[in-house]
Each structure stands twice: as structure tokens, then as C-alpha cells.
From Swiss-Prot:
Catalyzed reaction equations: 4-CDP-2-C-methyl-D-erythritol + ATP = 4-CDP-2-C-methyl-D-erythritol 2-phosphate + ADP + H(+)
Assembly and interaction partners: Homodimer.
Residue sites binding ATP per the record: P100, M101, G102, S103, G104, L105, G106, G107, G108, S109, S110
Name used for this protein in its record: 4-diphosphocytidyl-2-C-methyl-D-erythritol kinase
Annotated family: Belongs to the GHMP kinase family. IspE subfamily.
Record keywords, A-Z: ATP-binding, Isoprene biosynthesis, Kinase, Nucleotide-binding, Transferase
Biological role: Catalyzes the phosphorylation of the position 2 hydroxy group of 4-diphosphocytidyl-2C-methyl-D-erythritol.
InterPro entries recorded: GHMP_kinase_C_dom, GHMP_kinase_C_sf, GHMP_kinase_N_dom, IspE, Ribosomal_Su5_D2-typ_SF, Ribsml_uS5_D2-typ_fold_subgr
GO biological process: isopentenyl diphosphate biosynthetic process, methylerythritol 4-phosphate pathway; terpenoid biosynthetic process
EC top class named in words: transferase
Length: 286
């Protein structure tokens, strides 16, 4: 069986760090929304027993890549729980990468979630999305949001999701050619991890902010300059722990107009936000 799909990017419309847990992880509150832009996937299920990842330049089998980790985790769990009868289940996964790494757009997490959701279908392991999201949490905090496939306010360590409907808008997303490690940002001495936790109603009525933005502006001058430049045209802020910055527009034409006047060396794209993940729209016909 073959399945071709989009592994979508996301933006964080707001992101607050509300405390540090005893286990060292941080609690967050974030508004997580999908874009109709992302990496291109083609997954071919087979009975070779192997998980193979093909990119435009390399073939991977035994590497610490989120796609291979997700596929092997699903297979191992399904075998232990009797949802797969033998170890012959395998897959060839072809990836065309469009989402920059370390950009705050969730590329690695999206890839892991896409792998879990699609192989669950192709291998007929019959896990619910909730069950897959719990598996995904073992890979990364953003993975459950991608697995569930709805715009959501996400809390805790990524394990508490409140699906909502958010107005779909157009975004100009600009990449400053800087890769920022999530771990690096969470360990920053400048991180104030005590933003007051708010109710869902208050969160959605309060002007949106990102607790990591001031840290990024202090440590990465290009991000500071980029936010200043884009904010002169439209409401703009950083997504995730960086490095991408997005500007918000009511229509595509307005986004294109601003993109056209930016310096020619600026890298970016225009995308529409969507309340249902493009993956889930095609896979589940939502």
C-alpha cells in the first residue's frame, strides 16, 4: 500500500512557560495551529521488516531521526500488544524536506506524527489518535498536537489538548537562516518560566505573545531586526522557540504585497492557517 501526503508545519500563535516541574521539564500554554505548507511524504508499506527513509540525498535505516524512531516505536508497541502478528511489517518512506530545521515550525515533530498516523492506517494497527498521541509524547512534546490534527490550546508538557476553532488567516513566514535548539532555549538563563497560567477564555482574549521572543532578540540580532522590520507592516512575532517569524494578514494578496517589498535575500513563504491538519483532511476525509 502507498500513501502520499503533506506533513504540515505549525505556528504557535502564543507560547507561555508557566513553570518548571520537579522532573526538569517545563509546563507551557500555547495555541497551536497548522499551516497548509509542509514536507512532502510518500510511504510504501511492505513486508520486508525494514524501516527505510529516503531523502533527496541519502538513505537512512538506523539513525536517530524522528521518522525512523516513530516507525520503530509503533512497530515495537504493536508487536508487544498483539496488534501486529509478526515482525515482517516494514516501510519505505520518501521525504522531500521543505520545513527548515530549528525554525519553530515543528518539522521533526510533524514528521514523527505523520509517520505514526499513516503507518497506523497502512499496517492496520487500529490505534486511536489518542493512543497514538501518547506514543508520540515519548518522541517529543509537539508530536501529540500533530497527531490529534486540530487547532488546539496545549498545556502541560504537550499532553493536555483543548481543541478550538480559530479564525483561519494568511501568514508570511520568514526564516532568518538560523537554527535554534529547543533545548538551548529552554535552558537559557534569561527564560522567565513563571508566566501566570490563565484560563482558556482569558488566553484567547489577551493579546498573544511568545515568552521566548525576548530571549531570541537578545541572543540573535537577525531575529531582532527581522521582527522589527516585519512589525512595521503587520502584527508579527516569533513561532515556537524560534527562529522563524510570522506576520498575520486577512488575505493572501496582502501577504504577497509585503513579501514582494522585502529584501531579495529574505527567505520565506506564504501559507494559510487551517483548523484541521492537511494530513487528517485527506486521511480521514474530515
Amino acid at each position: 500500500m502507498i500513501y502520499t501526503c503533506l506533513s504540515p508545519a505549525k505556528i504557535n500563535l502564543f507560547l507561555y512557560v508557566t513553570g518548571r516541574r520537579k522532573d526538569g521539564y517545563h509546563n507551557i500554554q500555547t495555541l497551536f495551529q497548522f499551516l497548509d505548507y509542509g514536507d512532502q511524504f510518500k510511504i510504501i508499506a511492505n513486508k520486508t521488516g525494514n524501516i527505510e527513509l529516503f531523502t533527496e540525498k541519502k538513505i537512512f535505516m538506523n539513525v536517530q531521526n524522528s521518522i525512523i524512531i516513530a516507525a520503530k516505536l509503533l512497530k515495537k508497541t504493536a508487536l508487544l500488544q498483539g496488534k501486529l502478528q509478526n515482525s515482517s511489517y516494514g516501510a519505505k518512506i520518501f521525504l522531500k524536506k521543505n520545513i527548515p530545521m530549528g525554525s519553530g515550525l515543528g518539522g521533526g515533530s510533524s514528521n514523527a506524527a505523520t509517520t505514526l498516523v499513516v503507518l497506523n492506517k497502512l499496517w492496520n494497527t487500529q490505534y486511536t489518535l489518542k493512543e497514538l498521541s501518547l506514543l508520540g509524547l515519548r518522541i517529543g512534546a509537539d508530536v501529540p498536537g500533530f497527531v490529534m490534527g486540530n487547532t488546539a490550546v496545549i498545556e502541560g508538557i504537550g499532553d493536555i489538548l483543548y481543541p478550538i476553532v480559530q479564525k483561519e488567516k494568511w501568514y508570511l513566514v520568514v526564516y532568518p537562516c538560523i537554527n535554534i535548539s529547543t533545548r538551548y532555549m529552554f535552558s537559557s538563563p534569561f527564560l522567565m518560566s513563571n508566566t501566570a497560567k490563565k484560563s482558556l477564555q482569558v488566553l484567547l482574549k489577551t493579546p498573544f505573545k511568545n515568552d521566548f521572543e525576548n530571549i531570541a532578540k537578545k541572543q540573535f540580532v537577525p531575529i531582532k531586526k527581522l521582527i522589527r522590520m516585519l512589525s512595521s507592516y503587520a502584527p508579527s512575532r516569533m513561532t515556537g522557540t524560534g527562529s522563524c517569524v510570522f506576520s498575520e494578514f486577512d488575505n493572501k494578496k496582502s501577504a504577497q504585497k509585503i513579501f514582494s517589498v522585502l529584501p531579495k535575500n529574505v527567505q520565506g513563504f506564504i501559507a494559510k492557517s487551517v483548523n484541521i491538519s492537511p494530513l487528517h483532511k485527506t486521511l480521514y476525509k474530515r
